[in-house]
């Protein structure tokens, strides 16, 4: 009986000592069960990258780049980012480092054909084993957009150009430079069978656009936008 009385006297004390611990365990259990209901945290950088990957603008830029690579014959170590790009015969050591600029909008790179007898636009850079073929001949004064620059060291030796309608270039409006360089007759190596060259979107041209590689000395390159050609 003495033992029974001893236990009964101490039971409230044990209960009071254990109650805070029991409440703490209960709270932890409730927190663990509720945690999965919270939405996952996404970093701003991850969200931005995902939005860019699925945005129409990003896809359009990638499409333009892929089209330019195919038309120009340029090879890139990283085609998606347009890095490590070359044109020519790498195996023979006869090639050029290439900088790409697919867009021909307000920030585009423009020039005019300066040679008196015009210039052929070639399907490949003339290098060892290239067997370059003329796609068309541009007359003196033809306005072109430069989409790629082929360099030996730091010196531009070839440009990949596309002849575009001058009236589709916003910078040409009321610009005297586009009187000197504009639309000129184009001699094609084959009869055009598709749509004429036109702007599908600002800076993006589709249809039968005369395009190809030309020597750097055939052009007057606009050094400050489309305002004035660089001095010879």
Show the residue positions of the predicted features.
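Bacterial signal peptide processing site
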Residues: 29-32
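Short, low-complexity, Pro/Ser/Thr/Gly-rich segments in the mature regions of secreted, periplasmic
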Residues: 214-232
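SH3/SH3-like beta-barrel superfamily modules
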Residues: 55-98, 134-216
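Short alpha-helix capping/helix-loop boundary micro-motifs
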Residues: 126-133
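N-terminal secretory signal peptides that target proteins for export/translocation
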Residues: 1-12
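Low-complexity, Pro/Thr/Ser/Glu-rich flexible segments characteristic
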Residues: 35-52
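Sec-dependent signal peptide recognition
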Residues: 13-20
């Amino acid at each position: 009986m003495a033992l029974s009385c001893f236990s009964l006297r101490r039971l409230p004390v044990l209960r009071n000592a254990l109650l805070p611990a029991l409440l703490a365990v209960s709270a932890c259990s409730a927190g663990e069960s509720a945690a999965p209901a919270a939405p996952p945290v996404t970093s701003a950088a991850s969200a931005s990258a995902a939005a860019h990957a699925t945005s129409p603008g990003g896809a359009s830029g990638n499409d333009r780049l892929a089209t330019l690579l195919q038309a120009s014959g340029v090879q890139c170590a990283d085609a998606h980012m347009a890095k490590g790009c070359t044109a020519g015969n790498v195996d023979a050591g006869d090639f050029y480092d290439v900088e790409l600029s697919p867009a021909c909008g307000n920030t585009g790179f423009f020039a005019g054909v300066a040679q008196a007898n015009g210039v052929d636009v070639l399907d490949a850079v003339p290098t060892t084993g290239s067997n370059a073929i003329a796609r068309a001949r541009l007359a003196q004064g033809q306005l072109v957009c430069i989409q790629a620059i082929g360099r030996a060291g730091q010196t531009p030796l070839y440009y990949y150009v596309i002849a575009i309608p001058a009236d589709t270039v916003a910078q040409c409006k009321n610009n005297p430079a586009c009187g000197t360089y504009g639309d000129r007759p184009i001699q094609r190596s084959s009869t055009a069978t598709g749509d004429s060259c036109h702007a599908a979107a600002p800076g993006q041209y589709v249809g039968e656009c005369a395009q190809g590689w030309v020597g750097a000395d055939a052009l007057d390159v606009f050094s400050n936008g489309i305002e004035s050609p660089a001095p010879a």
